[in-house]
């Protein structure tokens, strides 16, 4: 093998190995971020005090207003329930039987949320929007 071809081959091998190592490091670090939220039935698998997202349906008759900006409510995945405490402004779509994602920490079996995200279906229309009437109807 000629010296120039040998140097090119070594350079290609080094670049390939570097790329494999780089992708491996990125995937290893992103592993925890791939799951968007944890359902209440899997909450026992998460360590206490670690920030995470939990998601489920707001259980009917579970919303309790503690103060003007403090509430507690229960979410469920129809397997297990989880009580959530939240202080702040509620999303406009927050209501019973609605899907939500709460971001916060688990502490002594209670979830303390710092942010709530209300989920909606693919037919969502923001409040105060008018659906234009179709011609001829």
From Swiss-Prot:
Heme binds at residues 120, 124. It is found in: Cell inner membrane. InterPro entries: CcmE (IPR004329), CcmE-like_sf (IPR036127), NA-bd_OB-fold (IPR012340). GO terms for molecular function: heme binding; metal ion binding. Heme chaperone required for the biogenesis of c-type cytochromes. Transiently binds heme delivered by CcmC and transfers the heme to apo-cytochromes in a process facilitated by CcmF and CcmH. PANTHER family: CYTOCHROME C-TYPE BIOGENESIS PROTEIN CCME HOMOLOG, MITOCHONDRIAL. NCBIfam families: PRK13254.1-1. Belongs to the CcmE/CycJ family. This is Cytochrome c-type biogenesis protein CcmE. The lineage of its organism: Bacteria, Pseudomonadati, Pseudomonadota, Alphaproteobacteria, Rickettsiales. The gene is ccmE.
């Amino acid at each position: 093998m000629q010296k120039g071809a040998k140097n090119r081959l070594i350079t290609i091998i080094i670049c390939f190995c570097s790329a494999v190592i780089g992708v491996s490091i990125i995937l290893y670090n992103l592993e925890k971020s791939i799951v968007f939220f944890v359902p209440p039935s899997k909450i026992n698998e998460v360590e206490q005090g670690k920030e995470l997202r939990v998601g489920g349906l707001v259980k009917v008759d579970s919303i309790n207003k503690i103060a003007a900006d403090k509430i507690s409510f229960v979410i469920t995945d129809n397997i297990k329930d989880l009580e959530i405490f939240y202080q702040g402004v509620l999303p406009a779509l927050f209501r019973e039987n609605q899907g939500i994602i709460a971001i916060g920490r688990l502490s002594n079996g209670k979830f303390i949320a710092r942010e709530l995200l209300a989920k909606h279906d693919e037919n969502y229309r923001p409040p105060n929007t008018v659906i234009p009437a179709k011609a001829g109807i």
